[in-house]
Amino acid sequence: MPMDKTFNAAEAEARLYDAWEKAGAFRAGANASRPETFCIMIPPPNVTGSLHMGHAFNNTLQDILTRWHRMRGFDTLWQPGQDHAGIATQMVVERELAKSGQPGRREMGREAFLEKVWEWKEQSGGTIVNQLKRLGASCDWSRNAFTMDPNFQRAVLKVFVDLYEKGFIYRGKRLVNWDPHFETAISDLEVEQVEVNGNMWRLRYQLADGATYRHPVAFDEEGRPTEWEERDYLTVATTRPETMLGDTGIAVNPADERYAHLIGKEVVLPLVGRRIPIVADDYADPSKGTGAVKITPAHDFNDWGVGQRTGLRAINVMSGRATMFLIENPDFTEGCAPSEEALALDGLDRYEARKRVVALAEEQGWLDGIDQDRHMVPHGDRSKVAIEPMLTDQWFVDTAQIVQPAIDAVRTGRTEILPERDAKTYFHWLENIEPWCISRQLWWGHQIPVWYGLDIWPARFEDDGDDTLDEVEIFELLEDGAFNHADPTHHCAFDFEGVSEKFLDDLASLPHPLNNARVVEVASRAEAIDRLAQALADYNLNEDPTHLVYPVWRDPDVLDTWFSSGLWPIGTLGWPEETPELARYFPTNVLITGFDIIFFWVARMMMMQLAVVNEVPFKTVYVHALVRDEKGKKMSKSLGNVLDPLELIDEFGADAVRFTLTAMAAMGRDLKLSTARIQGYRNFGTKLWNACRFAEMNGVWEGHATQAAPPAATATVNRWIIGETGRVREEVDAALAAYRFDSAANALYAFVWGKVCDWYVEFSKPLFDTEAAAETRATMGWVLDQCMVLLHPIMPFITEDLWATTGSRTKMLVHSDWPSFGAELVDPAADREMSWVISLIEEIRSARAQVHVPAGLKLPVVQLALDAAGREALARNEALILRLARLEGFTEAASAPKGALTIAVEGGSFAIPLEGVIDIGAEKARLAKTLEKLEKDMAGLRGRLGNPNFVASAPEEVVDEARTRLEQGEEEGAKLSAALARLSEIA
């Protein structure tokens, strides 16, 4: 059946992917013929996600490496999977419930809500898997993993318990990013900085005990004070007046002469009456604001640091919903008598409280002034609500105890990070690491395996010689609040059965009847108190010690998504079980990832795998850059410049999208993506398709089985192209081995389009009518087969379709053997001759184009001095040169005729007479005018780029665009200058 005229990507992609899956082409170990393994872990996309350009880029690079190793016979596994994406998924499901009019999360309760989440996951969670398939991702989908799968959950909980028991996980109170909308701590990666128009309020804090000081108010030209005024207050500046209720200090720089003598004194906090100290800290910058900084350790990360260094208290004055928490807050009222105005703020939203504080400051005279201020405010990337730094009880990993092996692994080369600059980022983060907050106040996720029970010890019970508690004693305990005020104690265990034993062990030392208690799980501390009180009362009625219950409740929080995804390499391979996959594929070979998650994911995987199994998770980390729009701007919905990879696949085909991303994947450099580039690479696929159609029409594959070795060839053209094929195979392998994806793509582009389609196909046409026809058919078939094989990792669909419709194949291209030949195929004599022929044709074409010779006009050529090798090459290839350079014929002369253009080649030169063909004077004038205008434009660009202010202050994409235009202009200028020089040589 003859080939179609064009490649129908939309039809072929679905058909071919289905065929690959049915053949088991992507399964681990498929096509393995050698003992080496190659394993790569997909960075698990969110189960809520859909394919964006970052995914398309990242997964294209992974697929190239996977297909390349699979074709080379490696035992290959590309492990796919999705992340449960705690906060994102919970948000999506809650939104769906609201849309459908169903009860909200809190109304239906945790268990029922989680059932809804699982229902949603089964119905909608596979979207991105299908989208990755459209891209051509050759993952082993039979092993598709999910971070909430039962086996993965076992791994996550075991690691938590193990690290807890080693002392690497603890519960503590620290400042975290708090999202008031979701009422949970979130990671730095889930915070986006938003620039807002706001105000800077200056507030006066009265010095305590009637203290005063001289404050400079006028200065001379050298900045020395010349006038002072007596003040009994300090002025501080803030963008968040509502937080002043939690102030516990004023920081001044110890080198600031204005305030140094006040260090150790106190001010009285307005509205609250709290006396707070003036402390010395370098965080206060004398050149910024008033030089005195209000310190609120519980609501600002910088202030928290000052508080830790200077011993200031941290007072949280907000609830989880960012409303003011004052009246029932013992920390707020301790040591002071807040005014009625302050207490009236209780329960107000933080922004409403801000207005009231400012109004009160103005009314009471401690508002010093207001300045407009444009500043950055952190927002939750999903809630779009301003983040509140919040002091809360959370679970933390003591990263300082597990970080060093992760640093050493990269320093010693056990794991290599490419490019090297990203290794520096990795080291910087890890060497300045903070405790990692791993708890989230959500329901969807890995619930923390910690159970709490009421801490009721023997000291609470009087020993009256009787092992039982009578009714009077029970009610006395209840009246005394033994249960209502009992502190919780906790135990960590893999499951409730394990933790029950720990609580029973603790009860062994308690007085009867508690030492015969049965441990049961309850929902909350309040329920635990009720259950224990009832159990004690029931005991006194029936005196049956086995009837007693000792209630415990589980920590309601879940683990940070990064905690579970940090175990992705071992968890997906079956750990903690000693599975064959774990033994075979771990540690993995390479991780392909974006620079934005080096710390959040890469560094944590390194730390956790080394802490858990004492092994690095991967040998190489390849960090790719961002995909931007064609002007270098970051893609965003607000700018309207987002390119949807699925829409691009619909329009241009997956192969064109993949090849574009690959060809632009220069290590460490952002991609500037345009549809014009993608269209150009679609044309590249069309070029290969047309070359194969030409070959088919000339019977190239008829009766020829696919062969790995090149055919025997005697014709110079055939010997030359066989050598070029060997060269490009070596180039592609070297590039892929070094993760220079762009070099591999560009080498293939130059070979397939340039050497094969533009030159070899044209050179071979006359040979089909000679005695070299059979050899040429065999050579062309072999060369085009190698094009398909070498291109397949980057352009899998069109190459597989060509493979299936040409020749006699024993297996699909996806499992075809990768060639091992190389530069040994180069025939030096054929290489020299055909390189000379190509050089001559290109020089003639270039000269014609530069001086605007009409494209269809055939010109005579005069052969000047030419060595023996050149004469032989010309004699053997004269007909080709005449046809492809559009020449009338060759004559020979000792010197160039008048009005001729000289062409220099290796071993000699030629002349092209132009007299009467073009108006040389007019052409020179045109070129000179064009060059003059271009030079003027270039001078302007050089001036802008030479201005440090422009380079420093202009948007990055504007500077990059100017540099690109200058580079392109200089290249065009060089061409124009060369053309002028050619014409100037004409006598």
UniProtKB/Swiss-Prot annotation:
Source superkingdom: Bacteria
GO cellular component, one term: cytosol
Keyword set includes ATP-binding: yes
GO biological process: valyl-tRNA aminoacylation
Subcellular location: Cytoplasm
Keywords: Aminoacyl-tRNA synthetase, ATP-binding, Coiled coil, Cytoplasm, Ligase, Nucleotide-binding, Protein biosynthesis
Positions annotated to bind ATP: 637
Protein name according to UniProt: Valine--tRNA ligase
Family: Belongs to the class-I aminoacyl-tRNA synthetase family. ValS type 1 subfamily.
Tagged with keyword ATP-binding: yes
Biological role stated in the UniProt entry: Catalyzes the attachment of valine to tRNA(Val). As ValRS can inadvertently accommodate and process structurally similar amino acids such as threonine, to avoid such errors, it has a 'posttransfer' editing activity that hydrolyzes mischarged Thr-tRNA(Val) in a tRNA-dependent manner.
Subunit-structure text: Monomer.
Domain notes: ValRS has two distinct active sites: one for aminoacylation and one for editing. The misactivated threonine is translocated from the active site to the editing site. The C-terminal coiled-coil domain is crucial for aminoacylation activity.
Record motif 'KMSKS' region, residues: 634-638
EC numbers for this chain: 6.1.1.9
Catalytic activity: tRNA(Val) + L-valine + ATP = L-valyl-tRNA(Val) + AMP + diphosphate
PROSITE patterns the record matches: AA_TRNA_LIGASE_I
Signal peptide: none
Motif ('HIGH' region): 45-55
GO MF assignments: aminoacyl-tRNA deacylase activity; ATP binding; valine-tRNA ligase activity
PANTHER family on file: VALINE--TRNA LIGASE, CHLOROPLASTIC_MITOCHONDRIAL 2, VALYL-TRNA SYNTHETASES
The organism of origin for this protein: Cereibacter sphaeroides (strain ATCC 17023 / DSM 158 / JCM 6121 / CCUG 31486 / LMG 2827 / NBRC 12203 / NCIMB 8253 / ATH 2.4.1.)
